[in-house]
Amino acid sequence: MAQSPIAEVICEPSPRMTQRLKRQQGATLASTGLRSPDEVLELWLDPRDNWTMVIAYASGTSCIVAMGAHWSSMQPQDPA
C-alpha cells in the first residue's frame, strides 16, 4: 500500500504557512481557485517541481492537504 508523504493534515495561521512554504521549501504560489465562499485552494511549487496543495480558510488558518513531486503544467488545448 502506498504511504502518504504527509501523515496528517498540517494547519497553521495563514501568514505562518506562507512563510514556511517560502522559506523552508523555496516554494512560490503558482495557482489559486475558489473552493467555497470560505475556502481558497492554493497550489505551491518549489524549484525542484515538488508541489504542495493548501486550503486557506476565511478564518485565517491554512492547511496542507496534499503534497507530491514532478509537477507538470499543461497548456490548454484548442478544442477545434
Where are these regions (language model features)?
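Polybasic/polar functional segments that serve as interface/processing modules
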Residues: M1-A80
